[in-house]
Amino acid sequence: MTSTPLPRLILGSSSPYRRELLERLRLTFEVAVPDINETPLAGESPEATALRLSLNKAQAIAQRHPDALIIGSDQVLTLDGRQMGKPGSHDKAREQLRLMRGRTATFHSALCLLDGRTGQSQLADVQTRVTMRDLTDAEIDAYLRLEKPYDVAGSAKSEGLGIALLSRVESDDPTALVGLPLIALTSMLRQSGYPFFAA
């Protein structure tokens, strides 16, 4: 009896942090960068935004690689119900960190595993509550000069020096905060026939 070969696995992300997380699973995968509009829709909840964008990213890659299994992911940060994206500049990053100091924000880390062959998708949203230390303006500016976290939601790279900005992290998945929830992903991959610990 012959087993069906597994489809190619593609990570649809430009993030080096997500790539590093996926490498932990010791699976062979490729990386492709999706090109989509990431603007939130009017009235859309943070969870809905993150889930929609993770699906859209996977679908964009599937158009180019219809024979593959594609991982799409997105992360949306909320504070008091307000969505906060990637700052893109020093001034906006400073503003974000000033707003969050001493307070608790929620990261929605959405994940999509899309089978390009069938169009079937699995979706999950893993939430992480993060409490910031009560940082001084000088600490915020020093951190921003050192790490330049302008490409991450919330302006704090928890996988780097940004961990020193935090006083508490609450999540069901320790990898969700970095942007790729591996517990949810391994469950999805198992359902798609990917073996872990195969002899």
UniProtKB/Swiss-Prot annotation:
It is an enzyme of class 3 (hydrolase). The keyword Hydrolase applies. Its EC number is 3.6.1.-. The active site is at D74. The record marks Y17, Q75, E159 as: Important for substrate specificity. SUPFAM superfamilies: ITPase-like (SSF52972). Its main location: cytoplasm. Its cofactor is a divalent metal cation. GO terms for biological process: nucleotide metabolic process. GO terms for cellular component: cytoplasm. Pfam families: Maf. It catalyses: N(7)-methyl-GTP + H2O = N(7)-methyl-GMP + diphosphate + H(+). Keywords: Cytoplasm, Hydrolase, Nucleotide metabolism. InterPro entries: ITPase-like_fam (IPR029001), Maf-like (IPR003697). GO terms for molecular function: nucleoside triphosphate diphosphatase activity. Gene3D superfamilies: 3.90.950.10. It is found in: Cytoplasm. The keyword Cytoplasm applies. Nucleoside triphosphate pyrophosphatase that hydrolyzes 7-methyl-GTP (m(7)GTP). May have a dual role in cell division arrest and in preventing the incorporation of modified nucleotides into cellular nucleic acids. Belongs to the Maf family. YceF subfamily. This is 7-methyl-GTP pyrophosphatase. It comes from Cupriavidus pinatubonensis (strain JMP 134 / LMG 1197).
